[in-house]
Amino acid sequence: MARLPGDRTRNPEHLTIGPLDLAARVDEALEVQAIAFGIGAEEVAVRRHIVLRHLDCPGARALGATTPTGRLAGFVYGMPNNRGHWWSTVVESYLRAQGNDGWLDGSFVITELHVHPAYQGRGAGRGLISALTDTCGLDRSILSAIDTDSPARRLYRSLGYTDLARQVLFPSAPRPYAVMGAPLPLPRS
């Protein structure tokens, strides 16, 4: 398991990144997501069913960043992409318009990556996504993020992700997304 040393002035705790039984800790993970992403209880209830369904997909894996007391500070999960999955069916036309729909084949999708705000900016997100993709067995990774200049998009760019399609509209999402892709392994900095 990877250890992230804490900055004594900003983060007195050490986070450990390792396998996460996301099905068993789904409520705790979604609490982190709700705080980090600003979603309400109704949306959390919808996402709970989605997460549990995703965990049944072949190759789905999850990692968590935990404090020494076992508290979940962040999590990531993903799976090998399947063109038949809802996400792929939504982004395919946007990727095709940019000549990038080939990225839907042979890619590992980062489905969710969230770090509690108290632990953001300290390497937990970078450690989670890098550890997950390091052992996915595929040559590239794709993800979607809200299409704005944000710490998340800056993190992804620093890891080698580039825009494959922008202004992607998901049903019921209030803001457009960008689909990003990167060759694996992700660079270390």
Range-by-range predicted roles:
Residues 110-117, 121-134, 154-158:
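Conserved acetyl-CoA-binding loop-helix of GNAT-fold acetyltransferases
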Residues 12-31, 39-42:
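A short beta-loop-alpha structural element at the N-terminal edge
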Residues 134-147:
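Conserved GNAT acetyl-CoA-binding A-motif
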Residues 1-13, 80-86, 90-91:
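Acyl-donor-binding surface of acyltransferase catalytic domains
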Residues 60-64, 75, 107, 112, ...:
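Short hydrophobic/aromatic beta-strand element in the GNAT-like acyltransferase core
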Residues 77-112, 170-173:
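Conserved acyl-donor/pantetheine-binding loop and adjacent beta-alpha core of acyl/acetyltransferases
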Residues 39-69, 73, 77-83, 98-99:
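Active-site rim helix/loop that mediates acceptor-substrate recognition in acyltransferases
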Residues 126-127, 147-175:
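Conserved active-site alpha-helix within GNAT-family acetyltransferase domains
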